[in-house]
Amino acid sequence: MTRKVSTRTTWEPVAGYSRAVAAGDFVFVSGCTSTSGGEFVHEGDAGAQTTQCITNVAEALERLGASLADVVRTRMFVTDISRWQEYGRAHGAAFGETKPATSMIGVAALVDPRMLIEVEAVAYKPGVGA
């Protein structure tokens, strides 16, 4: 059995995806960007964008009964790899001692040219998908 959540953004129906899917003992969170209330926020600020992305990940997890403490894997897709320390510091601050496995991948662009980062996550929480 799977459970799914949507944020009702304009992108979800166009691309045909869910914000997060709980399956078995795992929650898979789609890439989150620096949006709040459907609007882009924190233009030019790599750290603040990273924090907002992770806030959006946390909100999706919470809707399925999980939290950032359950995250075992993240991927950060960034448009300017030279700012890796800014992204990394914000990621480290958000996850603290959880310290999930992570990758930071440089990409040419994201869906909005103002977006510097997109974060996806996988959480492990026994029974979450039941």
Give the residues covered by each predicted segment.
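N-terminal presequence-like segments and the immediate start of the first folded domain
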Residues: M1-T55, E59-V72, V78-A130
